[in-house]
Amino acid sequence: MEKRVEKRRIVLVPVAAQGHVTPMMQLGKALQSKGFLITVAQRQFNQIGSSLQHFPGFDFVTIPESLPQSESKKLGPAEYLMNLNKTSEASFKECISQLSMQQGNDIACIIYDKLMYFCEAAAKEFKIPSVIFSTSSATIQVCYCVLSELSAEKFLIDMKDPEKQDKVLEGLHPLRYKDLPTSGFGPLEPLLEMCREVVNKRTASAVIINTASCLESLSLSWLQQELGIPVYPLGPLHITASSPGPSLLQEDMSCIEWLNKQKPRSVIYISLGTKAHMETKEMLEMAWGLLNSNQPFLWVIRPGSVAGFEWIELLPEEVIKMVTERGYIAKWAPQIEVLGHPAVGGFWSHCGWNSTLESIVEGVPMICRPLQGEQKLNAMYIESVWKIGIQLEGEVEREGVERAVKRLIIDEEGAAMRERALDLKEKLNASVRSGGSSYNALDELVKFLNTE
């Protein structure tokens, strides 16, 4: 009688946020398709927990809440993450202990989001291989390494020197010191300390990154040399895994019916992610700029994204009337389906990494309105490296909005960006096909996990 081969188990540990959960779950789907059992270890977070249940065949275990999420407002993002890591070690060890005792659970590996480095202690104690997963770009991972070696005092002094600001990091053209993502994490010193924790305290066996060689070959080569462990670029994971990933917000599918009535490449799609907030004036200027562009638009406005207002009631009635005649306003949209629709000609984005990849995969050029450090770096690559978008800088004014939309949708400049975006689309799709770089990287990762 043939001996039954037990499948090996992989434990995934995501950050409890849409931009981190989505690619982690896509990674899980890709590994599940290669024969691994998947367990997701998550903190107590009801909204995300209910969303993850849409993944049949995945097991879910809870890491007890060690630090209330409300503390992030008191501490700042970097300090909160460091405290979360300190307080989560013991509860995660207990979680892994229970999993290890279950019969038939041969844990091949713990794969954890780079910000959840508390997982290393449990991996080391139970002698389980661990792998880091970066949900952001390879270039951001490079920046973490660079920032981990800086002192806050010297960095602040250097940033007052224009010559130092514009200095290109060696071997990483066009990345400059002033492009390092230092905003959005609170005070500088806790951020640098967090980077040191993220980079220097790890004994992981490998790094997985949601990117592709055709997008970031220099950064990937730099990381491979600097880290001294295998680096696996598996992206874009939403096509590697053939899965859009979980949505934590209810999607308005009726917007697709509206898109079906629009002309090809005529619509500007606007979505600023799950966390962005706007001032009243900014929203009004956006509305007038979109109206004055005379282009149809699909505008995602999350409830509560404008302080003091539930949704769009802050707009004057005549503006709401014109907006709904010219465009479509949704509380949330099925983004991958929207970007792949032939009516969409451009994407106004906050330039989160998932949105950036999703736009490139569909060959859609972008208007970039980044809000914080990582997004600003992505926007720089979109505009200056890949040349598939334009940045909308400074205060949002209706004239600038109108001009940006026309440049992207109507002008020859936008047509050239679209051609470059379509070229990148083909390269990315080739990377996940048999023999492509991401396809091969996934096979190499599977071999690596089976030999660890």
From Swiss-Prot:
InterPro entries: UDP_glucos_trans (IPR002213)
Residue numbers binding UDP-alpha-D-glucose: 274, 333-335, 350-358, 372-375
Listed transmembrane segments: none
Pfam families: UDPGT
UniProt-listed Enzyme Commission number(s): 2.4.1.-
Keyword annotations of the record: Glycosyltransferase, Transferase
EC class name: transferase
Gene3D superfamilies for this protein: Glycogen Phosphorylase B (3.40.50.2000)
Gene Ontology MF terms in the entry: UDP-glycosyltransferase activity
Stored PANTHER family: GLUCOSYL/GLUCURONOSYL TRANSFERASES, UDP-GLYCOSYLTRANSFERASE SUPERFAMILY PROTEIN-RELATED
Family: Belongs to the UDP-glycosyltransferase family.
Protein name, as recorded: UDP-glycosyltransferase 76E4
Taxonomy of the source species: Eukaryota, Viridiplantae, Streptophyta, Embryophyta, Tracheophyta
Gene: UGT76E4
